[in-house]
Amino acid sequence: MKNLKWVAGVALAVGLAALPVLAQEAAKKEPPKPAPGPSVAVLEQWNEIGKKLIAIAEDLPEDKYDYKPNPDSRTFRAVLIHVSASMYFFTDPAQKQKPRYTDDPKPADLKINNKADLVAFVKKCVQDGADVIKAKGDKGMSESVNAGGPTLIRISDLAYALNEHSGEHYGNLVVYYRNNGMVPPESRPKK
């Protein structure tokens, strides 16, 4: 019995002594992967905010489309149209075209008559921008274009500006959701 306790004690001591070594081995990781190229980094951000806007467009109950927090604010529908249409302030100049919308288009001008039309419009705007970023690649994203400002702007900088603009309006939509007692899709528990 005494030998058994001694053997068990030694085994326990060896096991405990080995834990730090095992933990260090587990902590050793693969070296970090190289940073993504500029176009990949822009595309990841573009798609991330686009995914959030699409999720809201798909999730938002149609009876809330005309909600606005105060009379001077845009409605849910107007914010989604504004943020989506504004993506062409990147997409069009990046292709050396004039932006197709000089101001916020009206739902009737876009033939947006219902939720399905609005969801399709948001998806198209996001996809068109993603397609331009992919087509431009790293070299093309470093080209400069005339986007209507006082100086030329690098295409990647224009994309980052639109990503930021989209994120700001996503924040507006989150507040609209919360004001209506709803939880935005991105804030819900993951299943």
Residue ranges and their predicted role:
Residues K52, I56-A57, T91, D128, ...:
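Well-ordered alpha-helical scaffold segments within catalytic/enzyme domains
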Residues K28-P38, Q97-K111:
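Acidic/histidine-rich, surface-exposed loop or edge segments in extracytoplasmic proteins
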Residues Q45, L110-N146, R154-E168:
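Acidic/histidine-rich alpha-helical segments that form the ligand environment
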Residues L43-N47, I54, K64-K106, N146-K191:
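Short, contiguous alpha-helical
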Residues V21-E25:
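Boundary at the C-terminal end of the N-terminal hydrophobic targeting segment
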Residues G9-P20:
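Bacterial N-terminal signal peptides
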Residues M1-A11:
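Bacterial N-terminal signal peptides that target proteins for export
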Residues L60-P61:
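Membrane-proximal, proline-rich intrinsically disordered regions
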